Regions:
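N-terminal glycine-rich phosphate/adenylate-binding segment common to multiple enzyme folds
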Residues: 1-95, 202, 206
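Short acidic, glycine/serine/threonine-rich loops at helix termini
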Residues: 13-18, 72-77, 148-153, 188-191, ...
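Short coil/turn connectors at secondary-structure junctions
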Residues: 26, 40, 49, 55-59, ...
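Glycine-rich phosphate/diphosphate-binding loop of Rossmann-like nucleotide-binding domains
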Residues: 86-179
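Flexible, glycine/charged-enriched surface loops at secondary-structure junctions
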Residues: 133-141, 165-178, 273-285, 295-308
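Glycine-rich phosphate/nucleotide-binding loop
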Residues: 188-287, 291-297
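Phosphate-binding loop/pocket of nucleotide- and phosphate-handling active sites
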Residues: 303, 307-334
Length: 334
């Protein structure tokens, strides 16, 4: 069980700012690839923060595949007149070659990959999580366009569902639903929530932010990476909140929503308690979450939530005051 802080993925500007030797790949992508896990992100719902999508009544959990796609890509800039090809060299030395593009003008090319084993782990993690939560699970790709890459995801999910989970789902009264990613987006917006939406890595990255913001704030989103071996890594779903950090460095007071970071710690403490049979630790995690929610529902919140809240009596406080108020609520519960 681990807790991870927010990290940057450097671009050209960050390379200069932090004097980096190279444009390092995403730290999150690297960790996810090593653990071969699935990221589950779920909004934290509180009274007074109404979803932008008025018909959403229940949380929507995003299950994000944590391996491959653009997060483990290889990409190059291509000069005019060059030819880009996809080359597979097999174990026996034979090769398979496919033309990507003949570049009349300068351009770019990118190679992405995935593994059947990782997709299978992802599928099983999603189906197990759906059974545990007793919620329907949706999965979507663009298999009509990506007839090898995305279609592989669709086929593996269907195979594992039909051979390992269909009878369990029927017994639990839940269902597995597959559709195209664009259709899924439309269906999600029309739904009332209350299901798990399984997404490929990039889709999950984008849609988890959309769902979190539509429910209120990216600062109100839990995130846990679960590996097939039973490793749990909790983190805030948002990034490093760079603008607030720069203000902090200048000595300015910020009003930074720390709920997602707080819930990363409570999630990890609860899981550690569950694994160790430590009931008091689980209880402490539950009460800390309860204290955080009560603080917001009592009208004490950070600036981002203040702008969203429909509570009649509310006030915006700075980061330190917000945490102190949560501590006071926690003391009352302990």
């Amino acid at each position: 069980v681990a807790v991870k802080c927010a990290t940057i993925t450097p671009n050209a500007a960050r390379m200069t700012e932090y004097q980096l030797k190279e444009m390092w790949k995403s730290p999150n992508g690297t960790i996810r690839a090593i653990l071969d896990g699935t990221v589950f992100r779920k909004p934290i719902i509180v009274k007074g923060i109404e979803p932008y999508v008025s018909n959403w009544k229940k949380p929507i959990t995003i299950a994000r595949h944590a391996y491959g796609d653009i997060y483990k890509n290889t990409e190059l800039t291509v000069p005019a007149g060059a030819t880009a090809e996809l080359l597979i060299t097999k174990a026996d030395g034979s090769q398979e070659r496919a033309l990507i593009h003949e570049f009349k003008d300068a351009g770019i090319v990118q190679g992405v990959h995935n593994l059947d084993s990782s997709i299978r782990s992802f599928a099983r993690a999603c189906f197990n999580f759906a059974l545990d939560q007793k919620e329907d699970i949706w999965f979507a790709t663009k298999d009509t366009i990506s007839k090898k890459y995305d279609h592989r995801f669709k086929d593996i999910f269907a195979e594992i569902y039909e051979t390992e989970y269909q009878s369990k789902f029927e017994k639990a009264g839940i269902e597995y639903f597959y559709t195209l990613i664009d259709d899924a987006v439309a269906r999600v917006i029309r739904s009332e929530g209350g299901f798990i939406w399984a997404c490929k890595n990039y889709d999950g990255d984008v849609m988890s932010d959309m769902v979190a913001t539509a429910f209120g704030s990216l600062g109100m989103m839990t995130s846990v990476l679960v590996s097939p071996e039973g490793t749990y890594e909790y983190e805030a779903a948002h990034g490093t909140v760079t603008r607030h950090y720069y203000k902090y460095l200048k000595g300015e007071i910020t009003s930074t929503n720390s709920i997602a970071t707080l819930f990363a710690w409570t999630g990890a403490l609860r899981k550690r308690g569950e694994l160790d049979g430590n009931t008091p630790l689980c209880s402490f995690a539950d009460k800390l979450e309860q204290a955080a929610i009560q603080t917001i529902e009592d009208g004490i919140m950070t600036g981002d939530l203040y702008r969203l809240s429909t509570l009649p009596n509310k006030r915006s406080v700075d980061t330190e005051t917000f945490l102190k108020e949560i501590a006071l609520h926690l003391d009352a519960l302990l």
